[in-house]
């Protein structure tokens, strides 16, 4: 099993407080060839290694470059392209609702990952300015209506979003819409003012 993590933009406009890419600001969208080319270049680094999974979890917000990302999804999945099964391709988003709807309309079973990172609007709004435009309740509703496997992504921030009450609330949100959970250790590089949750916790 080999997962390739690819980017959709240079920088990011969303300014999530814990993200080094967000601190860079947004430069531009990547083209179809630039996005698909990442998969090609990674494969060429070690030709015997073939990608079994692709995740749009690198730099940028994929659903804010939907026109290019949608084309790349076709290239990745097509037998004449990379021939990777749709269920092995995951698009990650902070919750850009029009893009989630568009992804859900595709006939292929592409996976969706939602960057939640807080179980309440108050805390999520502090960490993720995009929560003003796309509130948590609307994002959760979109997950419930997606009709395919959805994963909640949750970066663990020491003393910020990792208390027992956060876990209880998060578990309820995930259970109510049948989502999987992916708890992510914080990479300290670039996340000024935050510390990782201790591994034991």
Regions found by a protein language model. Give the residues of each.
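Alpha-helical scaffold elements adjacent to nucleotide-binding pockets in ATP/GTP-utilizing enzyme cores
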Residues: 34, 38, 71-72
